[in-house]
């Protein structure tokens, strides 16, 4: 579990509160099932790396459990963010796109 999240007591699949969304996103590198990684920074930038090819985007928090991800030139999506908790420890996040329902699960490196 990332050190910055150790004080939180949350359940698996629980929506991430607005107060904790930035901390959840920036707690560490997320690794997805296909090996892609994503890093969020506190200044609202994000880098998604797939097969060694990085792409840069931006993100911002909307409210409880929701954030927006923008990828130039024109892709924007809103996601609901939920905790992944294993044996009482926060191990990652799930992202569900609000418009299409696509779900992605990332685990902290």
Residue spans for each PLM region:
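Lipid interaction determinants
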Residues: 1-56, 62-109
């Amino acid at each position: 579990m990332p050190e910055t999240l150790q004080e939180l007591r949350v359940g698996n699949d629980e929506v991430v509160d607005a107060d904790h969304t930035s901390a959840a996103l920036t707690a560490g590198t997320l690794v997805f099932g296909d090996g892609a990684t994503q890093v969020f920074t506190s200044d609202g930038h994000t880098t998604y790396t797939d097969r060694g090819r990085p792409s840069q985007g931006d993100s911002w928090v909307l409210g409880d459990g929701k954030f927006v991800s923008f990828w130039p030139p024109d892709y924007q999506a809103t996601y609901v963010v939920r905790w992944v908790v294993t044996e009482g420890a926060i191990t990652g996040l799930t992202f569900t796109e609000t418009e299409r329902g696509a779900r992605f699960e990332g685990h902290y490196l």
